[in-house]
C-alpha cells in the first residue's frame, strides 16, 4: 500500500484551498508513482486498491487534517486509510476520528527515548497496555502496525546526540561493558559497519525480540476489536 507521510505543520499552516490543492497533487503523484514504478513482471500495473496517509495530527490541527482527508477521498477512487497512533486511538473525543475507510493502528514508538532511559521506547508492554485496555471501541476497521526495526541512541557527555536505525546484530562487540539494561559504553574509537563510534561514548541499543512481538500481538488481539478479515488471514498464516 503506498503510504504518504505529511508533516503536521504542513496541515496546520494550510488554508482550505491549499489543503484541497495538496490533496489533488498527492493523489495525482501517487497514481503516477503506481503506474510508473510498481510494475509486475508481466508489465501489468501492480494492483493497488488503497492509498494510506501518515500524519501525526494533533487536536489543534484535526479539523484541517480531516478536511485534507475528505479531499483525498474526493480525488481518488481508491480506498483511503490513515495511520492512527495510540493516543488518538484511546482519546477519540479529543482527537476525533479520521474520515477514512480504515485505519492502521501504530503500536510502536510508545515513549520518548530522551526521557525514558531504562525502557525500550520502541515497544514496551506496560505502556502499550495503558492504551489498548480501554472501553472505547474505535469506529473504523483496524489494521495493526508492529515494529520490525532496531535503534541505537547515541549520547555525548550524557546528552542525546543522534539515533541510528538498523542496528547491526553484533554491535555489542565494540563495547567494553554493559552499564544498564540497554546501555553500553564504546571501548575505543571504532569504525563498524560503515558507522563511526567514539571511545567512551554511551549508546543505548533497542531491539524488538520475537517474543516481545508475540506478547504485544496477544495483548492487542485480546483488547482491540479487529477486522474479521484480518483475523482470518492471520489464522491462515499461523
Residue ranges and their predicted role:
Residues 7-9, 20, 36, 44, ...:
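Acidic-enriched, low-complexity/disordered segments with a strong bias for Aspartate over Glutamate
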Residues 32-47, 75-76, 130-142, 227-237:
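A structural motif corresponding to the C-terminal end of an alpha-helix
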Residues 13, 116-123, 202-208, 224:
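Short, exposed beta-strand "edge-strand" segments with a Pro/Gly-rich flavor and a Y/T-containing core
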Residues 7, 17, 21, 31, ...:
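Glutamate identity and glutamate-enriched acidic tracts
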Residues 154-232:
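Glycan-binding loop/region signatures in secreted carbohydrate-active enzymes
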Amino acid at each position: 500500500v503506498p503510504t504518504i507521510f505529511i508533516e503536521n505543520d504542513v496541515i496546520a499552516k494550510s488554508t482550505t484551498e491549499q489543503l484541497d490543492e495538496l490533496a489533488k497533487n498527492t493523489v495525482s503523484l501517487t497514481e503516477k508513482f503506481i503506474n510508473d514504478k510498481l510494475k509486475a513482471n508481466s508489465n501489468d500495473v501492480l494492483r493497488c486498491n488503497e492509498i494510506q496517509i501518515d500524519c501525526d495530527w494533533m487536536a489543534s490541527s484535526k479539523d484541517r487534517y480531516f478536511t485534507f482527508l475528505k479531499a483525498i477521498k474526493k480525488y481518488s477512487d481508491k480506498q483511503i486509510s490513515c495511520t492512527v497512533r495510540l493516543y488518538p486511538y484511546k482519546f477519540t473525543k479529543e482527537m476525533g476520528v479520521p474520515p477514512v475507510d480504515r485505519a492502521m493502528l501504530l503500536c510502536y514508538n510508545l515513549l520518548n527515548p530522551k526521557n525514558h532511559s531504562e525502557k525500550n521506547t520502541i515497544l514496551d508492554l506496560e505502556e502499550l497496555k495503558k492504551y489498548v485496555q480501554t472501553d472505547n471501541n474505535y469506529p473504523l476497521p483496524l489494521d495493526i502496525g508492529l515494529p520490525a526495526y532496531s535503534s541505537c541512541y547515541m549520547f555525548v557527555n550524557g546528552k542525546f546526540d543522534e539515533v541510528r536505525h538498523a542496528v547491526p546484530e553484533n554491535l555489542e562487540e565494540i563495547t567494553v561493558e554493559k552499564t544498564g539494561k540497554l546501555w553500553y559504553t564504546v571501548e575505543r574509537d571504532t569504525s563498524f559497519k560503515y558507522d563511526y563510534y567514539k571511545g567512551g561514548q554511551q549508546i543505548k541499543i533497542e531491539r524488538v525480540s520475537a517474543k516481545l512481538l508475540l506478547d504485544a500481538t496477544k495483548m492487542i488481539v485480546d483488547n482491540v476489536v479487529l477486522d474479521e478479515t484480518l483475523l482470518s488471514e492471520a489464522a491462515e498464516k499461523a
